[in-house]
Regions:
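Assembly/oligomerization interface modules of large self-assembling protein complexes
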Residues: 32-99
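Short, flexible loop/turn elements at secondary-structure junctions
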Residues: 66, 204-208, 299
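Short helix/loop capping segments that flank catalytic or ligand/cofactor-binding pockets
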Residues: 70-73, 112, 211-214, 304-306
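Structural beta-strand/beta-sheet cores of well-ordered domains, especially the beta-sheet scaffolds
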Residues: 58-60, 100, 198-200, 240, ...
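Alpha-helical scaffold segments that mediate packing/assembly in large oligomeric complexes
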Residues: 106-190, 313-327
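Sequence/fold signature of self-assembling virion shell proteins
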Residues: 2-45, 53, 159-180, 214-327
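Structured, hydrophobic secondary-structure cores that serve as assembly/anchoring elements
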Residues: 89, 94-118, 142, 175-219
Length: 327
């Protein structure tokens, strides 16, 4: 009986892998991936207090400290007025969810041979990076919406006399006033009673680094600032007590009156906002009606503000940034 053999294509080759086109090809590894932003979540939010919440719609309750009320002046023989201590609470719910579903044909796995483990690890790593990218946008967006009403705008601060800029009237930062800007942000948090040395952060757009470098060199030329505590090396990582975190996720808007990009800048205490996220389910399933396998992953994320008065936000433009052309 004739031996079984693979079907031969009209070209005379059993598969494209046997053609001269495929001969001599050597695998040289994978090119360098794009420059993904390093995760900063744990540096700007409390990621441990909600750690036990791993399912969508789970809720955790926080109690605010009890209030006893102010002391009253005493007069001889007066009838005492009593106060009753009060306490309220608030809840944070984990309500965000997202999934990733990837189909891989078994034939692709066989053809990949020894390269399959690297390929598999590559798309699993990228799936996590894409999830983390979603978390960055969600966290920064929600934190900006959670800033206390006295800690933003043109009338910020305890007395309403600190200007942090608005979308339509942003602060224009230059080497002449950049240090004053950091002082304003710090003062707002100090007046709110939420300044904790060594635990404060400031998330700035990457465009801020250009202004900081220009400021550093300008002051060195005029004032010999080489030993300044504000700038060490070419990157400022701590300014006036703020740990500086650069992020691409602070999206600007355009002020059409000036044609400048207006950026939000977020600062505060790293315990002010609670946030958690996790991939809670991951399965590898063989698909029906096809020779394929399905990678399924489900992630949940969410959080909420605990101390809104411990966050502050400003709107700024940069003298080192160019103008946006008219539409």
């Amino acid at each position: 009986m004739a031996q079984n053999s693979m079907p031969v294509q009209a070209s005379g080759y059993k598969s494209i892998w046997d053609t001269p086109l495929a001969k001599g090809v050597k695998f040289a590894g994978t090119i360098i991936d794009r420059n993904w932003e390093e995760s900063f979540i744990s540096r700007i939010a409390n990621t441990s207090i909600l750690q036990d919440l791993t399912k969508c719609a789970q809720m955790i309750q926080f109690k605010r400290p009890p209030q006893a009320g102010p002391w009253r002046p005493y007069e001889l023989n007066q009838t005492l007025i009593t106060d009753q201590p009060t306490q309220d609470s608030f809840c944070i719910t984990i309500c965000g969810s997202a999934y990733k579903s990837l189909k891989i044909d078994k034939e692709d796995i066989r053809r990949a041979c020894d390269d399959w483990p690297e390929f598999e690890q590559g798309f699993l790593d990228d799936s996590w990076r894409q999830f983390e990218n979603l978390l960055h946008y969600s966290l920064l967006g929600r934190m900006q919406l959670s800033v206390g009403s006295r800690n933003l705008g043109a009338r910020a601060g305890r007395d309403g006399n600190i200007n942090l800029g608005t979308l339509t009237s942003a602060l224009h930062l230059s080497p002449d006033n950049i240090l004053n800007f950091f002082t304003r942000m710090k003062m707002v948090l100090q007046q709110a009673g939420r300044w904790y040395e060594g635990e404060m952060f400031m998330v700035v757009p990457e465009e801020m680094s250009v202004l900081l470098l220009e400021t550093m060199f300008a002051k060195q030329l005029c004032c010999n600032m080489s030993e300044s505590l504000l700038f060490k090396g070419l990157v400022a990582t701590n300014i006036l007590g703020f740990t500086i975190i650069e992020s691409q996720r602070l999206r600007p808007t355009i002020d059409r009156q000036t044609n400048r990009l207006v950026y939000p800048i977020l600062a505060g205490w790293n315990e002010a906002y609670a946030f958690t996220a996790d991939i809670v389910d991951a399965d590898l399933v063989e698909m029906e009606r096809s020779f394929g396998v399905l990678y399924k992953m489900l992630g949940v994320y969410g959080g909420g503000v605990i101390y809104p008065e411990a966050l502050t936000k400003a709107y700024v433009t940069f003298s080192t940034a160019g103008l946006v052309p008219n539409p």
